[in-house]
Amino acid sequence: MRILGIETSCDETGIAVYDDEKGLLSHELYSQVKLHADYGGVVPELASRDHVRKIIPLIEKAMEDANTQPSDIDGVAFTQGPGLVGALLVGSSVGRSLAYAWNVPAVGVHHMEGHLLAPMLEDDAPAFPFIALLVSGGHSMLVKVEGIGQYEVLGESIDDAAGEAFDKTAKLLGLDYPGGPLLAKLAEKGEAGHYKFPRPMTDRPGLDFSFSGLKTFAANTIRDADLTGDNAEQIKANIAYAFQEAVVDTLIIKCKRALKQTGMKRLVIAGGVSANTMLRSEMKALMQALKGEVFYPSLAYCTDNGAMIAYAGMQRLKAGETLALSSQAKPRWPLDTLSAI
C-alpha cells in the first residue's frame, strides 16, 4: 500500500509518500517562518494563502522524488484537525479532491496522533503500550497509549503549552520568531545557579501542566534584570538557561509520575519541543535510572510534517477506515475521541 500524506495544520506545508513495504519514499516540507517573522507569530490568513501557493508544487515534487504516478497511490491521508481552520481546509480540500480524481480512499488524520506515531518511522520503533509526552507550540499532554486509537489522556496543559511558553519567553528576551529554538541555543551559553524559576504544578498531585505562570515569572525576571551593561547578553543567557531548566524539570517530574502511575517502562517524546537537546538528555537519564526506554522521532519529524500523517493514515486505511468526501475540517478535536483500530 502506498499513501500520499498531506500536513497543513499551521504554518508548515508537509507532503510525503509512504509505502508499507519500502518505507518513506519522499518527504517535502516548506516552512512559513520567514512569512510570519515580522508579525511575531502565525497569521492564520497568511498561512492559508501560502499553503494554497505551495501545496501543489510540493505534491508534484514528492511524487516525482518517490518515482510514483497517481495510479500507484492507494490512498490519500491529510490532517483533518486540530489546527487553524483555514490552513486545515487547504489540505483537506486538496486531499479529498485528489482522492476523488484518483479514485482512491481518503482518510483524515488527527494531527497529534501523527506526532504520537512519528517514532514509528524509525528503525527502533517503540512497541505498545507506552506513555507519550506530546509537547509542541499548541499542545502539552501525557497520553497512555495501548495501541493505535487506544488513548487515555492522563494530563494536559490548562493554559499555555510548553512550546508556546518557549516562544513567548524568547520574544521577551528580544529573540526572533520562532523563538523556542533560539532560546534553547542561547541557554547553551547560560550558567546554572543565577536564577531559580518555579516548577509549576509539581507541588500537588496530578499530571496536568501550566506554563502561563512560568512565562509571567520570566517576564518579571527580565524586567527586573539589568540589561544595559556589558554583560547583558550573559544575563539573558542565564535567564534562558533557568527558564529552559524549569520547563524540562517540570516535564521530567510529570513523566516520572505518569510512568509510576501506570507501571510502564516505555516513554515516547514527540512534537516540536521534543527536538530540545536538554529535554532529550534529561529524559534519557530518567529512563536509564528507571531501567526503561525512551523513544523520539528524528529531528526532521519532530516538527509538523507529511511523513507522520502518511504513516498514521496508512494504519487507519489498512484497518478499513475511510472518510466521506463531504467531511469537514476539525479545528478542535480531542485525541481521546479517536476510534481504536
Curated annotation (Swiss-Prot):
Function: Required for the formation of a threonylcarbamoyl group on adenosine at position 37 (t(6)A37) in tRNAs that read codons beginning with adenine. Is involved in the transfer of the threonylcarbamoyl moiety of threonylcarbamoyl-AMP (TC-AMP) to the N6 group of A37, together with TsaE and TsaB. TsaD likely plays a direct catalytic role in this reaction.
UniProt cross-references to NCBIfam families, sorted A to Z: gcp_kae1, T6A_TsaD_YgjD
Catalysed transformations (reactions): L-threonylcarbamoyladenylate + adenosine(37) in tRNA = N(6)-L-threonylcarbamoyladenosine(37) in tRNA + AMP + H(+)
Family, as annotated: Belongs to the KAE1 / TsaD family.
Entry keyword set: Acyltransferase, Cytoplasm, Iron, Metal-binding, Transferase, tRNA processing
Residues engaged in binding Fe cation: H111, H115, D304
Protein name: tRNA N6-adenosine threonylcarbamoyltransferase
Protein location: Cytoplasm
Species annotation: Alteromonas mediterranea (strain DSM 17117 / CIP 110805 / LMG 28347 / Deep ecotype)
Domain of life of the organism encoding this protein: Bacteria
Cofactor requirements of the protein: Fe(2+)
Source lineage: Bacteria, Pseudomonadati, Pseudomonadota, Gammaproteobacteria, Alteromonadales
Positions bound to substrate: L134, V135, S136, G137, G138, D167, G180, N276
